């Protein structure tokens, strides 16, 4: 199965990282892909795979430039933990508000079933989305422009 991009934008980072502490995943290692959305990108965010929303966790914070790495830990953000319906693996999506964006909109609920590409929310202008996953081959590249719900990020 494939993971599609959760956001329109530019891939700025692909690295191995520990999971978000807010979801008690700091002892697990994931592949993290960061997608920066500039003011001209569509800011609707989509589910990278079919699955069930297991957890949503909102964290207030600062409004630093979202292209900075520290924004994923300091800025206002919203976490989604999705259990992939095929692999059973957890996929984490993090919406990160930026310097201009001061509003994160969540459009799903815990326990909701999603199809790949379904709308999960949006962020207002100049923000970032991180996706964390395991056990997949990375298909995307740093510097690549991606489209939410369409561009392939990773595969089994």
Language-model features: locations:
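Contiguous, well-folded functional domains in the mature portion of proteins
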Residues: 1-156
């Amino acid at each position: 199965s494939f993971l599609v991009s959760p956001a329109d934008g530019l891939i700025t980072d692909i690295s191995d990282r520990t999971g978000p502490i807010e979801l008690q995943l700091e002892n697990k290692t994931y592949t993290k892909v960061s997608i920066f959305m500039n003011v001209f990108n569509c800011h609707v965010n989509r589910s990278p795979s079919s699955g069930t929303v297991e957890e949503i966790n909102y964290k207030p914070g600062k409004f630093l430039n979202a292209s900075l790495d520290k924004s994923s830990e300091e800025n206002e953000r919203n976490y989604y933990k999705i259990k992939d319906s095929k692999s059973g693996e957890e996929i984490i999506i993090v919406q990160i508000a930026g310097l201009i964006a001061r509003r994160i909109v969540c459009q799903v609920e815990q326990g909701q079933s999603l199809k790949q590409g379904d709308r999960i929310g949006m962020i207002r202008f100049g923000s970032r989305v991180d996706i964390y996953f395991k056990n997949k081959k990375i298909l995307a590249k740093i510097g690549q422009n991606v489209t939410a719900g369409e561009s392939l990020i990773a595969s089994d």
